[in-house]
Structure formats: structure tokens, C-alpha cells
Amino acid sequence: MQHPASGESWLARPPRTAERRLRPWLTDPASLTARIRMRCGMFGVRVLRQSAGALTPDERRLLGLRAGERALLREVLLIADGRPVVFARSVLAQREQRGGWLRLWRGIGSRPLGAALFSDPRIRRQPLACARIGAADARYHLARRALAGAATLPPALWARRSVFRLHGRSLLVSEFFLPAILGLPDDPL
């Protein structure tokens, strides 16, 4: 699905042009947090932001929001052995800020969101989509700023996203893979 305003194309599966070692990261529907933890000695979450904010046009479209409709944003870096490996951005529309999502959102702190999402059997994940996100997308620049010079970004980042549903309400989670992700060991045998 092409979104002309941002230039990215979200796909159900990564194209052949995606680096082979990155494909499992883009397609595994299990917890990204758990996958990273299995491949590093020390794992951490650096919360960059957890507040109301503006959405990109494709985030609004995916969540069925009108321009100007408010949402809570959570932006974090996932850190493996001291190196940022993923920039993640979660979006919760203001109208969805009730019940289970609101309790989860308020109580998450610096814990990984993935651990909470995958531990609640009531939460259902919709299919993953992936895209190559470049400088035309505001989220690329958010990731670059979050790194604060700790790493140089390539011209584009591979990302994946999906919507999680709880009692008919939606939470969008997008994960942008930073170059250091390829420094983690391959899948254990």
C-alpha cells in the first residue's frame, strides 16, 4: 500500500531487496523484545517520549483518525549490550484511552511495551507490515535525533508495524531497525 504523502510502501512481506539477515526481524510475529533479549547479555529501554503528539498521515489513516485528532505517543530506543538496535513508536488515539490500554499505558514506565502486550491473552496482534523508511518520513528523523550521534544511519531504515487490539480498541506499534541490529547473533540453532 503506497502512501504518497510520506513515500513509503507498507508490504505484507519484505521484498527480495531486504537484507537476508534482516528478514526474520521484519516477519517474526512474536515479541521483538524477547527476540532481542535472547541475543544479548544486557537489554534496556530508553524512554524518549511518552506524551500527546502529532501523528504522521499514514498513522492517522491506519487508525482511522481525522486530521487534528489527538493521540498519545511513546517513543523508545531498545538497547542491546549498550547499543541502540530499534527505535519504536507506539500510538494510542485519545478516544481509545480507556480501560485496559490506559492502565497499560500509565503503568508501563521504562519497561518494554512488548513484554506487556505479549503477556496478556486478551490482546490480539493484527498482521505485520514492513517498509523501507527514508528521509522523506518524519520518523526517520526522530530515530536519527534519538541516536544523538551514537550511530550513523543509512539513507533508509527497514521498519515493521502492526496494530494490537484489546476489546475492540487499537494500539499501533512501529519498530524501526537501526544498523546495530545486524550486530546481534543470528537465530540460535
Swiss-Prot record:
Record bears the keyword Iron-sulfur: no
Superkingdom of the source species: Bacteria
The EC number(s) this enzyme carries: 4.1.3.40
One GO-annotated biological process of the protein: ubiquinone biosynthetic process
GO MF term list: chorismate lyase activity
SUPFAM superfamilies, alphabetized: Chorismate lyase-like (SSF64288)
Protein name per UniProt: Probable chorismate pyruvate-lyase
